[in-house]
């Protein structure tokens, strides 16, 4: 049986897909744990090349021998909603000022994209979670079936 490596740290970052560089925030976060930063940036950029333009969260597990593993997550729901609504940012006063609209079908598409990371039993429940995020950003959801 292979020996288990001892975990030294778990680092969570949100980095632009295919564009990780040793500059902040990547360099200082990994350098503090003695990880080879260039090796990580090359591996991350290769793994996220197909998702260029999105921000892709990553969980980096650093072991005591300074080796590492990383697990990619799905892009944040807020970023996907902004892209779907064609906006730069959400509302500063979400329940008063509405800044955009998305359809229920767009919420379902985003829920399908985020399915591995969502805590939902099916796509409809996932879409409801996404719709809640949209509301908290000042984005109206049109065509939502009533409960």
UniProtKB/Swiss-Prot annotation:
Domain of life, per lineage: Bacteria
Role this protein plays: Forms part of the ribosomal stalk which helps the ribosome interact with GTP-bound translation factors.
Q: Which NCBIfam families match?
A: L11_bact
Is this entry keyworded rRNA processing? no
The UniProt entry's sequence similarity note says: Belongs to the universal ribosomal protein uL11 family.
- Entry keyword annotation includes Metal-binding: no
Query: What post-translational modification information does the record give?
Result: One or more lysine residues are methylated.
Q: Name one GO cellular component term.
A: cytosolic large ribosomal subunit
Among InterPro entries, the record links this protein to: Ribosomal_uL11 (IPR000911), Ribosomal_uL11_bac-typ (IPR006519), Ribosomal_uL11_C (IPR020783), Ribosomal_uL11_C_sf (IPR036769), Ribosomal_uL11_N (IPR020784), Ribosomal_uL11_N_sf (IPR036796)
Under the heading CDD domains, the entry gives: Ribosomal_L11
Which UniProt keywords are present, listed alphabetically? Methylation, Ribonucleoprotein, Ribosomal protein, RNA-binding, rRNA-binding
A single MF term (Gene Ontology): large ribosomal subunit rRNA binding
Swiss-Prot/TrEMBL GO biological process terms: translation
What protein am I looking at? Answer: Large ribosomal subunit protein uL11
Partners and quaternary state?
A: Part of the ribosomal stalk of the 50S ribosomal subunit. Interacts with L10 and the large rRNA to form the base of the stalk. L10 forms an elongated spine to which L12 dimers bind in a sequential fashion forming a multimeric L10(L12)X complex.
Organism field: Corynebacterium urealyticum (strain ATCC 43042 / DSM 7109)
């Amino acid at each position: 049986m292979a020996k288990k490596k001892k975990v030294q740290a778990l680092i969570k970052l949100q980095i632009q897909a295919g564009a990780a560089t040793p500059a902040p925030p990547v360099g200082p976060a990994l350098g503090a744990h003695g990880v080879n930063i260039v090796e990580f940036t090359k591996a991350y950029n290769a793994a996220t090349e197909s998702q260029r333009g999105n921000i892709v969260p990553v969980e980096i597990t650093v072991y005591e021998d300074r080796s590492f593993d990383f697990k990619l997550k799905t892009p944040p729901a807020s970023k996907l909603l902004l892209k779907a609504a064609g906006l730069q940012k959400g509302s500063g006063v979400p329940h008063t000022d509405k800044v955009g609209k998305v359809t229920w079908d767009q919420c379902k598409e985003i829920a399908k994209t985020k399915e591995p990371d969502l805590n939902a039993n099916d796509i409809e429940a996932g879409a409801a979670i996404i719709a809640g995020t949209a509301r908290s950003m000042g984005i109206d959801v049109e065509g939502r079936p009533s409960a």
